[in-house]
């Protein structure tokens, strides 16, 4: 199944049925009077969050959806049948945006939640409606109203409690394998992870949280380089971010430099996202045998970042330190939930932060889309470099194929 997290579709609700002009005509009833019925309402279009879906790939191939038109009115005061509503299933976590105004129509965050995106047309009136004491044989009717038509943009953001940040090969997928039953692909080359992966982490007998891994970020990601920038939006709804740093990289690069790249690119993508609760997780420390060297590398990263938050030293491969980290995450999430219920000011501050993150992420991605459109139309700036992989339509046949649908 191909992972598609953005699509554009056109929806058209059903038109209302026309009212009928008709008169009662029976033997021995010379002037039976009007009996034209009303038309039926047009069908509306709804989006429904379906917990069994995790991609918008179905809407990549079919992009126009029309609801059924209401039937016209009939004689003998018969009302036309209402057009059937059209229900379009989408994954939980889908944001619906009006493509013309960029207005957010709604957010589908709960299984079974429905959102009307196109209102069916109102029915027309038959001539019976216009009968009066002075007009006993009206010849007036009204047509049905046209159904609402809209161009929509659907954006999927996975719903997770914890988001993982890091360069390619920082050990994010290995971490998910260590703490959950998820089995994302793991290898010793960059960009092994091509789509977001989710894992459910069980803590104790009855508690759990969801962790999301996205493709790694690289230098220049905020300008569209690599794969990770497109998927950073999936971290917008997380409650806490884990910044994983490879402390023993194969190319012997400085871990402090790698950590600094992530913080810088995160800030360029969304300054508000840097205000989200974030913990520093130093991975692969088991590969550094000298305790003094281990401590020196740890302090170098902390000092370079000016870090004052929580720091964890783990080995995802050996599962060393992962259990304690998972328990602390669960404890933080429980305390956060309790505080949200008891402190309205804290809840409002988090809601405002969420809004800022959503707005900044959408603005950044829209800017990248606009720049890509300019390049494709031959107006590429002299200094611009089209180094992202999302307009690559060739299938190399190796691994999953990724589609970005503008």
From Swiss-Prot:
Molecular-function GO terms, alphabetical: GTP binding; GTPase activity; magnesium ion binding
InterPro entries: G_OBG, GTP-bd, GTP-bd_Obg/CgtA, GTP1-OBG_CS, GTP1_OBG_dom, GTP1_OBG_dom_sf, OBG_GTPase, P-loop_NTPase
Sequence positions that bind Mg(2+): 173, 193
Biased amino acid composition, Acidic residues: 385-399
OBG-type G domain boundaries: 160-334
Domain Obg: 1-159
Needed cofactors: Mg(2+)
Binding site for GTP: 166-173, 191-195, 213-216, 283-286, 315-317
Any one of the GO BP annotations: ribosome biogenesis
Role of this protein: An essential GTPase which binds GTP, GDP and possibly (p)ppGpp with moderate affinity, with high nucleotide exchange rates and a fairly low GTP hydrolysis rate. It may play a role in control of the cell cycle, stress response, ribosome biogenesis and in those bacteria that undergo differentiation, in morphogenesis control. Overexpression increases bacterial persistence in both stationary phase and biofilms in response to a number of antibiotics.
Family as reported in the entry's similarity comment: Belongs to the TRAFAC class OBG-HflX-like GTPase superfamily. OBG GTPase family.
Protein name in the entry: GTPase Obg
Organism: Pseudomonas aeruginosa (strain UCBPP-PA14)
Gene that encodes the chain: obg
């Amino acid at each position: 199944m191909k992972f598609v997290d953005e699509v554009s579709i056109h929806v058209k609700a059903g038109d209302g049925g026309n009212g009928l002009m008709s008169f009662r005509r029976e033997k021995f009833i010379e002037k039976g009077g009007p009996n034209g019925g009303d038309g039926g309402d047009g069908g509306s279009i709804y989006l429904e969050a379906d917990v069994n879906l995790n991609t918008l790939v179905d809407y990549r191939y079919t992009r126009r959806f029309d609801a059924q038109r209401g039937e016209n009115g009939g004689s003998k005061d018969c009302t036309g049948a209402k057009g059937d509503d059209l229900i379009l299933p989408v994954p939980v976590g889908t944001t619906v945006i009006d493509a013309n105004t960029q207005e957010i129509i709604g957010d589908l965050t709960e299984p079974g939640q429905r959102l009307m995106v196109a209102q069916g047309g109102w029915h027309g009136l038959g001539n019976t409606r216009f009968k009066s004491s002075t007009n006993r044989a009206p010849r007036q009717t009204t047509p049905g109203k046209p159904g609402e038509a809209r161009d929509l943009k659907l954006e999927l953001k996975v719903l997770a409690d914890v988001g993982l940040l890091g360069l390619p090969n920082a050990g994010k997928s290995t971490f998910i394998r260590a703490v959950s039953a998820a089995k994302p692909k793991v290898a010793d080359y960059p960009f092994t992870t091509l789509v977001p992966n989710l894992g459910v982490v069980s803590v104790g007998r009855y508690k759990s949280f969801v962790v999301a891994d996205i493709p790694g970020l690289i230098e220049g990601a905020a300008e569209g380089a690599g794969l990770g920038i497109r998927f950073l939006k999936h971290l917008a709804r997380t409650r806490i971010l884990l910044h994983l740093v490879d402390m023993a990289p194969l190319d012997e690069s400085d871990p402090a430099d790698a950590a600094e790249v992530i913080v810088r690119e995160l800030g360029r993508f969304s300054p508000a996202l840097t205000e989200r609760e974030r913990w520093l997780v130093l991975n692969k420390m088991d590969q550094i045998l000298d305790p003094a060297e281990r401590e020196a590398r740890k302090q170098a990263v902390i000092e370079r970042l000016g870090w004052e938050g929580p720091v964890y030293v783990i080995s995802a491969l050996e599962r060393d330190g992962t259990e304690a980290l998972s328990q602390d995450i669960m404890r933080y999430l429980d305390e956060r939930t309790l505080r949200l219920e008891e402190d309205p000011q804290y809840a409002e501050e988090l809601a405002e932060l969420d809004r800022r993150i959503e707005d900044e992420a959408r603005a950044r991605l829209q800017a990248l889309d606009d720049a890509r459109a300019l390049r494709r139309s031959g107006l590429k700036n002299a200094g611009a470099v089209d180094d992202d992989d999302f307009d690559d339509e060739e299938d190399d046949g190796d691994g999953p194929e990724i589609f970005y649908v503008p």
